């Protein structure tokens, strides 16, 4: 491998000749060989750095054009566009397990953008610190990258995934109107419910999850940029924080604003805890929905068997013909991972000692993993399972009319205690509710038929 010599305040460092990073990134690679190749800083963070570095250059150009010249702005902007597009991903090697402020990742961005910008300009035009990092500190850039990436992940990935599954459930509601089945509570038979009503519960659950995520977004759309080292805004021109938030909004097409209190923005990660709580709620609800589906699909002969789900692949290496609810299992495993991530996010957020949180990389690594896994799992569940759900009408009808909980319909006519006696007799003697009720003398056969209509109990 060919190398070039880079230097920083600590001296010279050998850097791979074909990489845009420089001394500080190289030192981090050497000092933190933890999870290399497996737990790289999330690409969402890298791309967010591209956004905020371009925005900072735009703000600096408008506020102090004598330092951020047209030529420098053009070079930085083009390099940042390449960072945002992902075409420079290979030049961002650092792992999550580094300094808790994300300083090395900030410098990785500064070095790559400066060296690529110099290549674009055809001369030594940009300095990583003096130009690319102008009016910034790692302490306000990394929190800003966290919020930008979180907003993009939720708005562009998670919410569209929810919308897709909601649309499927709406279609299933319409298709299954008029089908009545046994309801179940405590995993025991309960009074009847329309299958469309059961599906509407799933749909409404997801709609509420979407509302909770949307409620978290305004908090995430506040940016720390402009606070610099400890929140005082040292070395920033007046109005930089407002200008840079406006520039981020222009670049992303999303409405960001500067944080009202930069001291809070640097040291507290409560907005991310709140937002991840909404992701955890979504995970819990997806766990419930997936479990409902696999219970209803259990069988085919010895389970509930009330719905059919798509047969996507062989289910067993030893039992021929077995088909398992694999999409449901994938969703539930994702839900477990998200619930574990919530603990990590909360613990990391609690480590904001004095003026700076120093658990930011691990906080965001888990947050973004949760958002990504949920979005992808929901789409997969929708496309490979939910879209193909079909009611087993015969099994639903059989289970409904075999349920002892239909006796609840008799309460107004024979009273609770007599209804309980009817159900117990029917169960003990393995006879129908009608036979039990008539034999106990509570109703005549004709009267029973007049008042007992399971399909009307919904």
Language-model features: locations:
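Conserved, well-structured ligand/cofactor-binding cores
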Residues: 1-458
